[in-house]
A protein has these predicted regions:
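Sensor-1/coupling segment of RecA-like P-loop NTPase cores
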Residues: 43, 56, 62-68, 124-128, ...
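C-terminal alpha-helical "lid" subdomain
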Residues: 227, 231-341
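A short, basic N-terminal segment
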Residues: 1-58, 340-341
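Conserved catalytic network of the ASCE P-loop NTPase/AAA+ motor domain
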Residues: 38-39, 52-56, 83-86, 136-140, ...
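Mid-core helix/loop region of P-loop NTP-binding domains shared across ATPases and GTPases
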Residues: 101-109, 116-161, 170-173, 234-243, ...
Length: 341
């Protein structure tokens, strides 16, 4: 965002990534997931699918939400809370290329986070490595929660092997819960018949993001971004804020459109920003099929693979010029698989 735009509207910082806007839904979701990790009784109210506890006490947990809803910040705060409480050891898989993550890589992550040694030695022999892992858990004497971000990119074979990893730890006297964080594609993939072995054991939490608090979020993010002595009403009319709240769903969308509105308003000297400027920057394609699928974690490759379609067919479907019969066929298949259409 240009500094001259920020000066014109009295912004101390761009209205993106301004911090954590906590709602009761955020707090309840955090409590529910923490309860699931600790293995305490009672299904959580936000639980989309009640998975079972795996033999030995470990759990498979999934936290899913659309792009830009704040699940990464929620996950980060949850990890910090668990570390502060000290009842659970928190581990993370940091590998960037999630599609190439395998169980040995996850075991390596556990070694690095659980080992008291500065120089961690991991055996190249699988039998020795797995026995050493069991010994690490026995020494830890606490449950462990392994967090995996962008889990919608994990290979199906890796997903199905997570159950065996939890059982391996349990057989050695330890307790491991695995928390997968990803887009709604992850939830839908877990419901596919070929994923039944792990899907039926997964506790899925669907994070609703702001829910109906978009208007409150706009006020909050403006107050967090504006300089001293500048109020939200000085830079954005009430009608303009209400229109943004009605059209947008996530903090990421709101932040991006506020930036666009300020930049467009600066060009014409509009202060405060009114509904005319807001309408000009709102995309008419915001709720088209392609952006909806993208927000849920689907790209061209994943759609081609899942629905046995040709890339050209998917491109034409997204453009709206695929023949009606094939369009109905693909959209019916997508709806049946849980995709937003």
């Amino acid at each position: 965002m240009l500094t001259e735009v920020m000066r014109f509207y009295g912004l101390a910082r761009p209205p993106i990534d301004a911090g954590f806007f906590e709602t009761e839904h955020h707090a309840q979701m955090s409590r529910d997931i923490r309860t699931a990790i600790m293995g305490e009784a009672g299904p959580a109210p936000h639980q989309a699918k009640p998975g079972g506890m795996i033999s030995g006490g470990g759990r498979l947990i999934a936290l899913t939400s659309v792009i830009g809803s704040g699940k990464t910040i929620l996950s980060r705060r949850l990890r910090a809370e668990l570390e502060r409480e000290g009842k659970v050891i928190v581990s993370r898989a940091l590998s960037v290329d999630k599609a190439k993550i395998s169980v040995p890589l996850l075991i390596a992550a556990l070694f690095y986070d659980l080992s008291p040694e500065k120089q961690v030695k991991i055996s190249s022999q699988s039998e020795r490595r797995e026995r050493d892992l069991q010994e690490l858990f026995r020494r830890a004497k606490k449950p462990v929660a392994l967090f995996i971000d962008d889990a919608h990119d994990l290979h199906p074979k890796t997903l199905t092997a997570l159950k065996r990893l939890i059982e391996l730890v349990a057989e050695g006297g330890g307790q491991l819960s695995i928390v997968l964080v990803g887009h709604p594609k992850l939830k839908n993939d877990l419901r596919r018949p070929k994923m039944e072995e792990i899907g039926d054991r997964m506790t899925v939490f669907e994070f609703g993001g702001l829910r109906d608090r978009q208007r409150d979020y706009i006020d909050w993010v403006l107050k967090a971004s504006l300089g001293q002595g500048v109020t939200p009403e000085n830079v954005l009319t009430d009608d303009g804020a209400t229109l943004l709240a009605a059209k947008l769903k996530t903090p990421l969308q709101i932040g991006q459109h506020l930036v666009r509105a300020f930049e467009a308003g600066f060009e014409i000297g509009a202060k405060p920003i009114d509904t005319g400027v807001v309408e000009a920057v709102l995309s008419s394609q915001l709720d088209d099929l392609e952006p909806q699928l993208t927000r849920n974690g689907y790209d061209l490759r994943s759609l081609v693979e899942q629905f046995d379609a040709k890339p050209a067919e998917i491109r034409r479907l997204l453009r709206g010029d695929l023949d009606p019969g094939r369009t109905r066929e693909l959209l019916d298949e997508m709806r049946a698989a849980g995709l937003p259409t």
